[in-house]
């Protein structure tokens, strides 16, 4: 009789442990109209749902715009650069290349360039070349500080990414890169 009671107690304990490891929250996306009625609802979301192609493409577009834009407002330029580095890990080649680009040649340094000119970036296409590599094309319009068009150029980049599971992110990491999409490497050229 005691062995039966012990067996029942063990099964109950294992059942409790099993239930405690299961997620209690199941995320859903629900759209409501102006009156608060449900207009559309999706099924349960998977953990990887947010890392779809559109989120990756938006991250890549942000990366190019933040890296290539030159604005005379120092505060905005600083924010662009901080957001740019949120998409790279220090150990990746992309960080070293970006450091060289921003700090190497004074003519490429956005703070120095902003003394004479401004650069606006317009993304024209983002195409997946593989699961982790994307080709991005964009137009850059360079203007003088008075606003007259100085030059216009078409650019192309190949960017390699990787995705980190954001479930283990700290609060700061979630604020800076919520999707966990990181730029591993990049190369760009004027065409």
Predicted regions and their residues:
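Solvent-exposed, amphipathic alpha-helical segments
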Residues: 59-70
